[in-house]
Amino acid sequence: MRRLRRSDFAESRWGGPWLALPALLVGATGLRLVGVRYGLPFPLLNPDERNIVPRAWAMTHGSGADPGWFDYPTLVMYVLAPFQSWHDEPSYLTARIVVIALGAAGIAAAWWLVWKAYGMLAGFVAAATTAIATTHVAYSRMAVTDVPLTLGATVALALMVVGRIELAGIAVGLATSAKYPGVILLAPLVAAAWGKWRRFAIAGALALVAFAATSPYVILRFGDAAGDAARVQRSARDGWLGFENDNAAPIAFVERLWDGLGPVLVVAAIGLVLALVHRTRADLVLAVFCLVYFAQLMTIEAHFDRYVLPLIPALGALAGRLRSVAPVTILLLAVPLTWSVRDTRDLTKTDTRIAAHRWIVENVPKGARIAVDPSTPDLTGYRVVHLLLPRPGEPFDPNRDVDRLRGEGIRFLVLTGAVEDRVLAAREHYPRETDFVQEARRGGDRVYRVLPDGRFGGPWVEVLRL
């Protein structure tokens, strides 16, 4: 562990190191709070919110601690559940605020990790990188598992760096209980405990205990959980709508990292090379984590930006390692900050799907039969047919047939660019789905359309009368 030197305080020049962190946390939290109400009362920021928040709410309203669903472990649901107890229905806003708090804790954890490894100024660089990275900013507003996983990973890495191997094992278990890829933290744990195999064995046992204590039904219903986890992994490996024409996985995920970090990624790459050359304990822990985590992404064809999120604090640490260029790195953070502010500004608008929902409620009689694309607001009081999301390798949804819909008495169809733009961009992979959109537009009357503009954010939405 690198000892803190008096010179580190002089290097900061930010009004004192203990003032810089609170100021950074206040600014980062403020940035994340803007747009936190986007799409409410519907989970339009991320469809996974619909899988997590209602289950957390149900846990404090009589359903018990078993979620009955294991695409993710249960720690995040358990964390959210107490804050749902006073609500009469699932509160996406409350859940998002809890995740914002976890995101702020992750920024502080990045500071702590790098302060212990490379000094105070490097810690500020890592914390600022985490605070500003577009991916971290965006997912801190979403009541999903990615920011909690990143927090757990950062705390685990920090404990490894300072040699608290057993406590690091507990943190590994908690990170894995937030999201299954946390198990990859066992690789840097091996590096941190190299030659101390008894301590590693204890840490591994503590990791299992921490996981079992916070996701007990994954253990108790292991068959169901293993099946759900394997299905999620297969889906990620097979790809997802929108990534059909992407670059190969190594290039695609570097692009996702660039989208989050901008030119700071170059500084982090140089820091990674230096870490591999010098190989201090901190260097090895960070380098092993980054390399092993990135390597496992190579098997994935669904190139979601959230998959690189746990790398952000570690890459910020490696960028901060180059203390001699820290002022330049801080200036380079202006690029992702500009991107984050731009994205945040869009979240101050009304989502187009909310506007379409209001139009339907005001103009379509209750009880009417409506077919809708995924990721659209609930239409209470209507008889709704939910169209399935087209995906690589999945069978064609028979409801994506205009004649069939008409034959079943469905008179309205809601299409959204969040789905159909991706279908049309990969029409060679989805010829029948493309024909469905074109036939619906030819044979139906467009009674409402809303586009993203100065008033509205989100995808275009069309309501067609069949």
Residue ranges, per PLM feature:
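Perimembrane helix-loop-helix junctions
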Residues: 5, 9, 159-167, 184-208, ...
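Signature aromatic-anchored transmembrane alpha helix within multi-pass, membrane-resident enzymes
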Residues: 21-22, 204-209, 317-342
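Short helix- or helix-capping micro-motifs
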Residues: 25-31, 126-131, 154, 158, ...
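Transmembrane-helix motifs of polytopic, lipid-linked glycan transferases
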Residues: 26, 89, 93-118, 155
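Transmembrane-lumen/periplasm boundary regions of multi-pass, lipid-linked membrane glycan transferases
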Residues: 34, 51-55, 72, 78, ...
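Catalytic lumenal/periplasmic loop and adjoining terminal transmembrane helix
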Residues: 37, 41, 76, 217-219, ...
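Specific aromatic-rich, kink-prone transmembrane helix
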Residues: 105, 109, 129, 148-171, ...
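Short acidic/glycine- and proline-prone juxtamembrane loop motifs at membrane-interface regions
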Residues: 138-148, 304-305
